[in-house]
Amino acid sequence: MTPREIASQAAHAIAVLNELTHGGGELSNSTDVRAIVRSLELIGQGLPQLCEQLARFLVIQHEDGQLTNADGLDPDDSVTEVIEALAAAGQAADMMTAALTEARAASQVLSPARTRGWESRQEAD
């Protein structure tokens, strides 16, 4: 598979997760939430490196004269803009990952409640 195909699959996986979890959909309990958050955390950990590698590729392509601007202008400004945006995306991914780590850690104390029988519910009322 190509990097492009894998990126498309990753985007599709997030879209499917959004569909499956809409309104609680396919979620069973807090353990499901914690597992999904952990997976998102792992994705987030890899995004800064990926953004850096994409930027590095564009720099090399530009230095080798392999990039042109569709408007016929010098591609310097466009390449710089893409590189800066990718750097910002990498930083945002770091922040997202930190928040996901915090969410996962905070969720450790949550567990599914025991189902109480009808008698226990009446006593609680």
Regions found by a protein language model. Name each.
Residues 1-111:
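Hydrophobic alpha-helical segments that drive targeting, anchoring, or assembly
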Residues 106-125:
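Short, charged, intrinsically disordered terminal tails
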